[in-house]
Design a protein with these regions (language model features):
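Flexible, glycine-rich loop/tail regions that form catalytic "lids" or insertion modules at the edges
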Residues: 7-35, 44-51, 99, 358, ...
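Short acidic (Asp/Glu) and glycine-rich catalytic loops that position anionic groups and cofactors
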Residues: 62, 108-111, 181-184, 219-222, ...
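Generic secondary-structure signature for well-ordered alpha-helical cores
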Residues: 87, 91, 134-138, 160-168, ...
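Phosphate/diphosphate-binding loops
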Residues: 124, 147-150, 162-164, 187-208, ...
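Extended, hydrophobic alpha-helical segments in both membrane/secreted and soluble proteins
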Residues: 154, 243, 266-292, 308-334, ...
Length: 539
């Protein structure tokens, strides 16, 4: 071989891998598909197993929903941000709640001090919820609420406000995250032990089936699993394992699979590795369709469809050279779109530093609008299909996820896998491996371990006025002083009674809310009966 050819054949690395550590071939050909029928014949969009998308015409009929996640400080402050985003072309709302709201504590709880309105909006009562959606008719928008341990309470608050607006409950559209299992393995905002928490999940399924037919009763979330450090394969596997557990719990509670499965939805991370991420979404869709058909004998085609929201990867954003995050977010969003998402949130450039400013949030929204209107990727359906690389990686991820699912089944299911610490340990190992790769410069991160700036330029960031917490606490105190305490206490007593039976909890929660019971009071009523989850130490 000539010196020129030898130089041309020399590669940059000895081994090429995806960001998750999966090997990447030098060249993908038809032989890379290895006779895999699904890879060689990916089928058509809108047809089982939905590798190419869940709808026949995908974005040629309707673009994905641009649903920017927002919420901070008080309900009034967040309402201003929602109305601003809607005025700029956003089509759906996505609500971020503060930590006290997420774990069932009122804003005046001692442990809430310093956290009120910090990472999301503070919601204590129906009055706060009414302010949050003031001037926004709830039967004209779809709303996603990222809430889990207190999902039943926040859903009932939303319904109570809709009733006050005179909206038809049959027209309410949206999603409540309601995915408690991932809290035990990745995020930590749990309250109750696993058993009672799963009971609340299935109560929501059953109640919404009749009361809110257009509502998505759960968003089974891989996003936080990936943010905790998992690989793409683990994100698919552990998310679908959670999904299997929820379906089985609903069946055990007496629900028929096709009565609730069409309202299941999913939430995935859109990370940096473009090809791996596109393939990940396709693999998840195909695998879920097969699980629902083969394992649960679902007959309704909608029960087989993995509908998903995506959010760009917060953990990939860097505090160093934060303007670079605009590019990261743009590429991640492109992966989600090419992977066939139904809705998308694009992170803001400043989120490694603080909650997003209004200007940063607008750039994030404009990123989606540019992808939709200027790149042409939405003009044809599943343009990546047939790529040897994409189809091969799709099958590789599906096979890896199946292996994890088999292991979880052997452990007795996802609940047992969580309680034994298996899932947490697997995620921790992957997180360690990734961080080590960054620190040894095997994994390059621009601005962090390569192409660093000698002096970092500061950008404007959002700060929350501490006075807003005092104002929130004062409003809560005023609510308690003016409500009919006897009626409130009576509704909480009814909730306690129901919680000791198998009766559905949501009618009692709604009644308590309409009588001005607070998020903390309702949560404490259930704590008194169910107890609190004690985390296992996983080494």
């Amino acid at each position: 071989m000539s010196d020129l050819k030898q130089d041309q054949a020399r590669e940059r690395k000895a081994v090429f891998k995806t960001i998750s550590g999966q090997p990447v071939e030098r060249l993908y050909t038809a032989e890379s598909l290895g006779g895999d029928h699904a890879a060689e014949h990916p089928g058509f969009p809108g047809e089982f197993p939905f590798t190419r998308g869940i709808y026949p015409t995908m974005y040629r009929s309707r673009l994905w929903t641009m649903r920017q996640y927002a919420g901070f400080a008080t309900a009034a402050e967040s309402n201003k941000r929602y109305r601003y985003l809607l005025s700029k072309g956003q089509k759906g709302l996505s609500v971020a709640f503060d930590l006290p709201t997420q774990i069932g504590m009122d804003s005046d709880h001692a442990l809430a001090a310093g956290e009120v309105g910090k990472v999301g909006v503070a919601i204590d009562s129906i009055e706060d919820m009414e302010t949050l959606f003031a001037g926004i008719p709830l039967d004209t928008v779809s709303t996603s609420m990222t809430i889990n341990a207190t999902a039943a309470i926040l859903l009932c608050l939303y319904v109570a406000v809709a009733k006050r607006q005179g909206a038809s409950l049959g027209k309410l559209a949206g999603t409540v995250q309601n995915d408690v299992l991932k809290e035990y393995i990745a995020r930590g905002t749990y309250i109750y032990p696993v058993g009672p928490a799963m009971r609340i999940v299935t109560d929501i399924f059953a109640w919404c089936r009749d009361a809110l037919p257009r509502w998505n009763t759960i968003s089974i979330s891989g996003y936080h699993i990936r943010e905790a450090g998992s690989t793409a394969v683990q994100e698919v596997a552990f998310t679908l394992a959670d999904g299997i557990a929820y379906v089985q719990a609903a069946l055990d509670a007496g629900l028929a699979v096709d009565d609730f499965a069409p309202q299941l939805s999913f939430f995935f991370n859109a990370h940096n590795d473009l090809l791996e991420e596109i393939a990940k979404f396709r693999a998840a869709r195909r695998l879920w369709a097969r699980i629902m058909k083969e394992r649960f004998a679902a007959k309704d085609e909608r029960s087989l469809m993995l509908r998903f929201h995506a959010q760009t990867a917060g953990s990939s954003l860097t505090a160093q050279q934060p303007e670079n995050n605009i590019v990261r977010v743009g590429m991640q969003a492109l992966a989600a779109v090419l992977g066939g998402c139904q809705s998308l949130h694009t992170n803001s450039l400043d989120e490694a530093l603080a909650l997003p400013t209004e200007d940063a949030a607008l750039i994030a929204l404009r990123t989606q609008q540019i992808i939709a209107q200027e790149t042409g990727v939405a003009n044809t359906i599943d343009p990546v299909a047939g790529s040897y690389a994409i189809e091969s990686i799709t099958s590789q991820i599906e096979a890896g996820a199946r292996a994890y699912l088999n292991k979880i089944d052997a452990l007795g299911g996802m609940r047992q896998a969580i309680e034994s610490g298996y899932v947490q340990t697997e995620i921790q190992k992957s997180a360690f491996d990734y961080q080590r790769a960054v620190e040894t410069r095997e994994q390059m991160v621009v601005g962090v371990n390569d192409f660093q700036a000698e002096e970092e330029r500061k950008i404007p960031t959002l700060s929350i006025d501490p006075a807003l917490e005092r104002e929130q606490v004062a409003r809560l105190k005023a609510l308690r002083s003016k409500r009919d305490s006897g009626k409130t206490a009576a509704t909480l007593a009814e909730l306690e009674r129901r919680s000791r039976t198998s009766e559905n909890l949501l009618p009692a929660i709604l009644m308590a809310i309409e009588n001005y019971a607070t998020v903390g009071e309702i949560s404490d009523t259930l704590r008194a009966v169910f107890g609190e989850y004690q985390e296992s130490v996983v080494l």
